[in-house]
Amino acid sequence: MIGTGGFIGASLRYTISSRVPKIQNIPAGTLTVNLLGSIVLALLTFSSEPESVVYLVNIGMLGSFTTFSTFAYETFRLLEDGQNISFFLNIFLNVMLCLLGVSIAYLALML
Protein backbone atom coordinates (compact mmCIF):
# COMPACT_ATOMS: atom_id res chain seq x y z
CA MET A 1 0.00 0.00 0.00
CA ILE A 2 2.76 2.42 0.87
CA GLY A 3 4.56 1.60 -2.39
CA THR A 4 1.42 2.29 -4.41
CA GLY A 5 1.01 5.63 -2.69
CA GLY A 6 4.68 6.38 -3.35
CA PHE A 7 4.27 5.75 -7.07
CA ILE A 8 1.23 8.03 -7.21
CA GLY A 9 2.91 10.78 -5.19
CA ALA A 10 6.13 10.78 -7.20
CA SER A 11 4.19 10.89 -10.46
CA LEU A 12 2.06 13.79 -9.25
CA ARG A 13 5.11 15.67 -7.98
CA TYR A 14 6.86 15.37 -11.33
CA THR A 15 3.74 16.47 -13.21
CA ILE A 16 3.06 19.50 -11.02
CA SER A 17 6.69 20.58 -10.53
CA SER A 18 7.42 20.48 -14.23
CA ARG A 19 4.38 22.58 -15.14
CA VAL A 20 4.58 25.36 -12.55
CA PRO A 21 7.04 28.03 -13.72
CA LYS A 22 9.51 29.85 -11.51
CA ILE A 23 8.28 33.14 -10.11
CA GLN A 24 11.02 35.75 -9.63
CA ASN A 25 13.57 32.87 -9.57
CA ILE A 26 11.58 31.12 -6.81
CA PRO A 27 11.06 27.41 -7.62
CA ALA A 28 7.27 27.63 -7.46
CA GLY A 29 6.78 23.99 -8.46
CA THR A 30 8.45 22.74 -5.29
CA LEU A 31 6.61 25.33 -3.23
CA THR A 32 3.31 24.19 -4.76
CA VAL A 33 3.81 20.49 -4.02
CA ASN A 34 5.01 21.20 -0.48
CA LEU A 35 2.03 23.47 0.21
CA LEU A 36 -0.51 21.03 -1.23
CA GLY A 37 1.13 18.15 0.60
CA SER A 38 1.06 20.02 3.91
CA ILE A 39 -2.64 20.77 3.54
CA VAL A 40 -3.61 17.20 2.59
CA LEU A 41 -1.43 15.76 5.36
CA ALA A 42 -3.11 18.01 7.92
CA LEU A 43 -6.61 17.20 6.66
CA LEU A 44 -5.99 13.46 6.95
CA THR A 45 -4.07 13.64 10.21
CA PHE A 46 -6.65 15.76 12.00
CA SER A 47 -9.62 13.78 10.67
CA SER A 48 -10.61 10.25 11.63
CA GLU A 49 -9.60 8.39 8.47
CA PRO A 50 -8.94 4.64 8.67
CA GLU A 51 -5.34 3.61 9.29
CA SER A 52 -5.07 2.07 5.81
CA VAL A 53 -5.91 5.43 4.21
CA VAL A 54 -3.34 7.19 6.39
CA TYR A 55 -0.64 4.69 5.33
CA LEU A 56 -1.52 4.95 1.65
CA VAL A 57 -1.81 8.73 1.52
CA ASN A 58 0.27 10.24 4.34
CA ILE A 59 3.24 7.90 4.28
CA GLY A 60 3.21 6.60 0.71
CA MET A 61 1.77 9.31 -1.48
CA LEU A 62 2.69 12.45 0.46
CA GLY A 63 6.09 11.03 1.43
CA SER A 64 7.05 10.97 -2.23
CA PHE A 65 4.94 13.95 -3.29
CA THR A 66 6.44 16.56 -0.97
CA THR A 67 10.16 17.09 -1.12
CA PHE A 68 12.42 18.67 1.45
CA SER A 69 15.59 17.60 -0.33
CA THR A 70 14.62 19.39 -3.56
CA PHE A 71 13.65 22.47 -1.54
CA ALA A 72 17.07 22.41 0.16
CA TYR A 73 18.95 21.93 -3.12
CA GLU A 74 17.04 24.63 -4.99
CA THR A 75 17.47 27.03 -2.08
CA PHE A 76 21.20 26.35 -1.95
CA ARG A 77 21.46 27.00 -5.70
CA LEU A 78 19.81 30.39 -5.23
CA LEU A 79 22.45 31.28 -2.63
CA GLU A 80 25.26 29.90 -4.79
CA ASP A 81 24.03 31.97 -7.75
CA GLY A 82 24.10 35.14 -5.63
CA GLN A 83 20.33 35.53 -5.61
CA ASN A 84 20.19 36.42 -1.93
CA ILE A 85 16.69 37.92 -1.92
CA SER A 86 15.25 34.90 -3.73
CA PHE A 87 17.18 32.64 -1.33
CA PHE A 88 15.57 34.14 1.77
CA LEU A 89 12.19 34.57 0.10
CA ASN A 90 12.12 30.90 -0.90
CA ILE A 91 12.82 29.80 2.68
CA PHE A 92 10.24 32.19 4.09
CA LEU A 93 7.52 31.24 1.59
CA ASN A 94 8.00 27.49 1.98
CA VAL A 95 7.95 27.54 5.76
CA MET A 96 5.24 30.15 6.28
CA LEU A 97 2.84 29.02 3.53
CA CYS A 98 3.09 25.37 4.56
CA LEU A 99 2.42 26.28 8.20
CA LEU A 100 -0.47 28.48 7.11
CA GLY A 101 -1.85 25.62 5.01
CA VAL A 102 -1.74 23.23 7.97
CA SER A 103 -3.38 25.84 10.21
CA ILE A 104 -6.19 26.49 7.73
CA ALA A 105 -6.80 22.75 7.28
CA TYR A 106 -6.94 22.30 11.05
CA LEU A 107 -9.35 25.20 11.52
CA ALA A 108 -11.54 23.99 8.64
CA LEU A 109 -11.93 20.60 10.31
CA MET A 110 -12.67 22.15 13.70
CA LEU A 111 -15.61 24.22 12.39
Curated annotation (Swiss-Prot):
Q: Which reaction does it catalyse?
A: fluoride(in) = fluoride(out)
Q: For Na(+), which residues are the binding ones?
A: 63, 66
* Pfam families (UniProt xref): CRCB (PF02537)
Which Gene Ontology cellular-component terms appear in the entry? plasma membrane
Provide the transmembrane region boundaries. Answer: 26-46, 53-73, 91-111
Activity control, as annotated, is: Na(+) is not transported, but it plays an essential structural role and its presence is essential for fluoride channel function.
Subcellular location, in the record's words?
Cell membrane
Q: Which GO terms describe its biological process?
A: cellular detoxification of fluoride; fluoride transmembrane transport
Alphabetically list the UniProt keywords. Answer: Cell membrane, Ion channel, Ion transport, Membrane, Metal-binding, Sodium, Transmembrane, Transmembrane helix, Transport
The entry lists its GO molecular-function terms as: fluoride channel activity; fluoride transmembrane transporter activity; metal ion binding
Could you tell me which InterPro entries the record lists for this protein? FluC
Q: What does this protein do?
A: Fluoride-specific ion channel. Important for reducing fluoride concentration in the cell, thus reducing its toxicity.
The UniProt entry's sequence similarity note says: Belongs to the fluoride channel Fluc/FEX (TC 1.A.43) family.
Record-given protein name: Fluoride-specific ion channel FluC 3
State the organism of origin.
Answer: Methanosarcina acetivorans (strain ATCC 35395 / DSM 2834 / JCM 12185 / C2A)
